[in-house]
Regions:
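Coil-to-alpha-helix initiation sites in intrinsically disordered, low-complexity, charged segments
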Residues: 15, 182-183, 193
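Alpha-helical protein-protein interaction elements
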Residues: 23, 30, 176-177, 193
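N-terminal intrinsically disordered, acidic low-complexity segments at the extreme N-terminus
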Residues: 1-3
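N-terminal type II signal-anchor transmembrane helix
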Residues: 6-46
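Short, isolated positions within intrinsically disordered regulatory regions of eukaryotic proteins
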Residues: 20, 35, 139, 188-189
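A structural signal for short, hydrophobic/glycine-enriched beta-strand patches
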Residues: 40-188
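Short, solvent-exposed mixed-charge patches
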Residues: 220-222
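A transmembrane-helix-recognition feature enriched in membrane-embedded lipid enzymes
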Residues: 187-217
Length: 222
């Protein structure tokens, strides 16, 4: 009798293990399908038909982003430029001095003084969105071009649309040389980067579903 009970207990345990394994495999399959779908949403190029916007915002994280923002400002595609997430010890002169002169458009001193703003409060993508939303309200702007790395664009757009529902947000991706979007699965560094970005995107997406009113809770630096 005791042996029968042991056998029944072992049988139930194995059933639970199989069910948990099956559940894990289902979730893993869904995650992989989602990853592939996420990668297909990453921009592959810049829209050649650029419409002018009230402003442009650069999310710090690479010189290519800043160069792109300055080019949009210099070409008249944006009235003002916000650089969001700047270190508190950095000023405009320091930022401009960090760029290659040959890659930097020439801007008049008065343009730099009037039309480039630095945001010091954001410490993550949510913070970037909130910082930009505050600045847009102060400037009374209604359209903005978002400049960040292509792989970062889906999550950035999600956060910006959430923080600024009444503002037109247009993507302007840049493409870091070290990120290999084509055949990304063959490049371990790029694969790791995209997996981490996809997981962050899922967290941001789930946060919006569970806490739809949390746009104002993004952490900012004092």
């Amino acid at each position: 009798m005791r042996q029968v009970r042991r056998n029944e207990t072992e049988l139930r345990r194995r059933r639970w293990v199989r069910r948990l394994l099956l559940l894990f495999l289902v979730f893993a399959l869904i995650w992989v399908i989602g990853l592939v779908a996420f990668v297909t949403r990453i921009p592959r190029g810049v829209d050649p038909n650029l419409a002018a916007t009230d402003a442009a915002v650069v999310l710090t994280g690479g010189s290519e982003r800043l160069e792109a923002g300055l080019e949009l400002l210099a070409s008249g595609h944006a009235k003002k430029l916000l650089i969001s997430g700047v270190n508190k010890d950095v000023d405009i002169a320091t930022l401009l001095g960090s760029l290659e002169p040959s890659q930097t458009p020439k801007l008049a001193p008065e343009t730099i003084a009037c039309c480039i703003a630095l945001g010091y409060s954001a410490e993550d993508t949510r913070g970037n969105a909130l910082e930009t939303a505050d600045w847009m309200r102060q400037e009374r702007f209604k359209s903005i071009r978002l400049i960040t790395a292509a792989y970062h664009m889906p999550r950035s757009l999600l956060e910006f649309h959430r923080a600024m529902p009444g503002v037109q947000v247009l993507p302007y991706p840049v493409f870091p040389r070290q990120v290999k979007q084509e055949s990304w699965w063959r490049w371990p560094g790029t694969t790791n980067l995209l997996v981490r970005e996809y997981n962050k995107y899922l967290v941001a997406l789930l946060r919006g579903l569970v806490l739809p009113g949390d746009a104002g809770l993004a952490p900012v630096r004092p």
